[in-house]
Curated annotation (Swiss-Prot):
It is an enzyme of class 2 (transferase). The active site is at 135 (schiff-base intermediate with substrate). Homodimer. It comes from Colwellia psychrerythraea (strain 34H / ATCC BAA-681). The gene is tal. This is Transaldolase. HAMAP family: Transaldolase_1 (MF_00492). GO terms for biological process: carbohydrate metabolic process; pentose-phosphate shunt. Its EC number is 2.2.1.2. Keywords: Cytoplasm, Pentose shunt, Schiff base, Transferase. GO terms for cellular component: cytosol. Belongs to the transaldolase family. Type 1 subfamily.
Length: 320
């Protein structure tokens, strides 16, 4: 059965579609509500020809902030993430997610300090807090940083989320939004089991996000569920109806080119469950330790974001 409108247009009727890219042209093409960036996407964007002016501007700005070479690199990296965010905000009507340096993932106070710095840079450019999400890894320390930032009126996007324990702790901390990963969970199970083909509705990443979504709605948590890290459009279509989905330009293109009917799979139920006592740090760490997939994928995600952050800083160092 086909529909006269594209799958992307149909999906937008039931889910807020977010662009998972730093590429302005791709964002302009697909007209998402919001956009998300991360160190890997920023590295990619900073290599694009049309961003070289921004790269130079960030380096020039960093030189005015400090005489210390190491500090200049850090400042330039923060500035480029904000400058790219500002360009994206000219196109999207909603929010930009900008990530805190992954090397701070186990340091609550340093994460809060970095978040304040990023927010101040956006504010100085005339952007109010309600258009920004600060991205933090869903470590215990990242979740605690988000808890404090939310109390200050700074909304957070908790990323690298692979487990129910992480999702529960984020909601209990009052996080504005979580980004539970789908494709990376599938990657782990494929490697672990040697099984290569999963029907979309049996995809372990899809199952994980579905259970988190249903739990949040049942418990009456306001934290937004934004599925992330997709490997194919089958995963996306199985999560139609999720609060938000952040999708790469390549997969948005596939959805835009298909007119097959999109069926809403997730629907918010009435909140009927009594809230449980909040997870303690000990319970959180124990549950994470019991989940090898989440433990390995969280650690790997932090390492990989750090690798790309360092590559970006190397590019900037060469210009300083």
């Amino acid at each position: 059965m086909t529909n006269s409108s594209s799958q992307l247009a149909q999906l937008k009727q039931m889910t807020t579609v977010v662009a998972d890219t730093g590429d302005i042209e791709a964002i302009a093409k697909f007209q998402p509500q919001d956009a998300t960036t991360n160190p890997s996407l920023l590295l990619k964007a900073a290599s694009l020809p049309n961003y070289q002016g921004l790269v130079k501007d960030s380096v020039a700005w960093a030189k005015t902030q400090s005489d210390n070479a190491e500090q200049q690199v850090i400042d330039a990296a923060d500035k480029i993430s904000v400058l790219i965010g500002l360009e994206i905000l000219k196109i999207v009507p909603g929010r930009i997610s900008t990530e805190v340096d992954a090397r701070l993932s186990f340091d609550t106070s340093a994460s809060i300090t970095k978040a304040h710095k990023l927010i101040a840079m956006y504010n100085e450019a005339g952007i109010s807090n309600d258009r920004i999400l600060i991205k933090l890894a869903s470590t215990w320390e990242g979740i605690k940083a988000a808890e404090q930032l939310e109390q200050e009126g700074i909304n957070c996007n908790l990323t690298l989320l692979f487990s129910f324990a992480q999702a529960r702790a984020c909601a209990e901390a009052g996080a504005y939004l979580i980004s539970p990963f789908v494709g990376r969970i599938l990657d782990w199970y494929k490697k672990d089991t040697g099984r290569n083909d999963y029907a979309s509705n049996e995809d372990p990443g899809v199952v994980s996000v579905t259970s988190i979504f249903n739990y949040y709605k049942l418990q009456g948590f306001n934290t937004v569920v934004m599925g992330a890290s997709f490997r194919n459009i089958g995963e996306i279509l199985e999560l139609a109806g999720c609060d938000r989905l952040t999708i790469s330009p390549q997969l948005m293109e596939e959805l835009a080119n298909s007119t097959d009917t999109v069926i809403q799979k997730l629907t918010a139920c009435e909140a009927t469950a009594e809230k449980e006592a909040a997870l303690s740090q000990a319970e959180f760490r124990w549950q994470m330790n019991e989940d090898p997939m989440a433990t390995e994928k969280l650690a790997e995600g932090i390492r990989n974001f750090t690798i790309d952050q360092v590559k970006l800083e190397k590019q900037l160092t060469d210009l300083l």
